[in-house]
Amino acid sequence: MFEKRGYMLDISRDKVPTMSTLRRIVDLLKVCNYNQFQLYTEHTFSYSKHETVWRNASPITAAEIRELDAYCRMNDIELVPNQNSFGHMERWLVHPEYNNLAAMPNGGAVTPWGTIKKDPTTLDPSNPGSLELLSGLYDELLPNFSSRLFNIGCDETFEIKDPEAYLGFLLKVCDLVRERGFRPMFWGDIILKHPELVERLPKDLIALDWGYEGNHPFADETAKFKAAGLEFYVCPGTSSWNSLSGRVENMRENMAAAEAAGRRNGAKGFLVTDWGDFGHWQPLAASLPGMILGGWFADHGPKANRMDLEEALDSVMGVPLGGTLLRLGTLYLRGGALRANASELFRILSNDRGYSRHPNLTESVLVEISAVAEGCRHAAAAFTSPTLYGPGAVWAEEIVYMANLVDAACHRRDERRLKALREEHRRVWLLRNRPGGIDDSLSKFPRF
């Protein structure tokens, strides 16, 4: 068993849950024996002096954080504050008021995957205004939490090529955190690219070693943090994002690798991450297998592989759709058209130009996938009556929507299906989430 067993939900890729949904998530985390919860935040906290950034996002407020913190404490869960503080700041830096704080004000950073970031994403570590901004944010955010930990992010700083500049700014941000009585946690990806810097990190930092594929080298990476005497967590993911209906087998392998390496090298915690890249199209149901299995791995180690996930899903949802959900979550394997951090079906649906379909994903394979999705849709549709099935009907609605996402990917040029899907996306979104962000999410759907 890991001492710290956490779940982190992305609330900054357009989708901010309602308070009712957040409470239900806490209920689920308690059932799964988690003891930490984080809300990944870029721009979706209602900072009083920065309305420009969050105006259309339906942000979470200070009062709501205090309410959620109290609810978490009632359930023996620590609500850990989370505010990215170096990279992933594009929602700030695109605005004229903040653009001067960007390392590359005109954008154009090249990612490790060869893509180009149109907008600026990273704070300029040489600009004193960057620390001044963060100082003000921390003063407003942190007093709402009873936890003394704080996840400052600092991952994927694409514009910063000098490792010394990265380390220097990271250490200054950590000073701001300590001054407010908190202990900093940070994503370890950049430091791991420069292992000579690991030894220079203060020993009170908590490194978060993230990776989301089944073959991620957790063993090698955690060994570096262990050798440096740093406390660290292993951070696998639900594999729900960029997938339409999940990547269940990858999720299993990813969590098993994280658990094994974390156990071997003495990880303090196991943090399940649940991202919403490219519009957070997937509903909560797509993440549910990973939420449950992640709790099992964190609490029971390798025994998790022998537990009955379908039965657990049925129990949590209150409707017998666990098998249906898992079938949808394995459709990405059909045809052997695999890619990292996404499903081929997602790529088909999300790219309306310049995309070349994987040669293994033939028309006959798409017909086969569509038929399975239709069967799953039909099975879930039988449980969508709130009168008969209560909260289980929402899970069923989400599974129907996931099946329709997959079917739309298989019929990518069917304008009628895509128009209906856009309407369904909005309706299903509002079952659990606030309205802010829907239009941004829909802007990533195919257009005609």
Regions found by a protein language model. Give the residues of each.
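Feature activates predominantly on carbohydrate-active enzymes
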Residues: 1-161, 165, 172, 176-178, ...
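Substrate-binding groove of N-acetylhexosamine-processing glycoside hydrolases
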Residues: 27, 67-70, 76, 128-143, ...
